[in-house]
UniProtKB/Swiss-Prot annotation:
It is a multi-pass membrane protein. This is Uncharacterized protein MJ0519. It comes from the Archaea. The chain crosses the membrane at residues 8-28, 30-50, 63-83. The keyword Cell membrane applies. Keywords: Cell membrane, Membrane, Transmembrane, Transmembrane helix. InterPro entries: Prd_NiFe_hyd_3_EhaK. It is found in: Cell membrane. Its main location: membrane. It comes from Methanocaldococcus jannaschii (strain ATCC 43067 / DSM 2661 / JAL-1 / JCM 10045 / NBRC 100440). The keyword Coiled coil does not apply. GO terms for cellular component: plasma membrane.
Length: 84
């Protein structure tokens, strides 16, 4: 149970950082609102994992979510440094 909680806490921290990064990129007038909404939804799902069954499923697909956060950072850097 403690291992599961630590995974959820780490993932929550990663989502919070991703949302903050999205807001900062958006302040530079680059439209990343859909990404902010997606990560906000994931953050809400992560924080609301009170049900043990849902928490175990989140633990099972944790690596996928971490890859999603990594892909988000790559996308944000692409939008920030390579203008269209």
């Amino acid at each position: 149970m403690d291992k599961m909680k630590s995974y959820i806490y780490f993932f929550t921290i990663a989502c919070i950082i991703a949302v903050i990064y999205c807001v900062l990129v958006n302040l530079l007038q680059i439209n990343v609102i859909p990404v902010v909404l997606a990560f906000s939804l994931i953050l809400i799902l992560t924080i609301s994992t009170i049900n043990k069954k849902i928490a175990h499923k989140m633990e099972d697909i944790e690596v996928l979510f971490m890859l999603l956060v990594l892909a988000f950072f790559a996308y944000a850097i692409y939008k920030l440094y390579i203008p269209v």
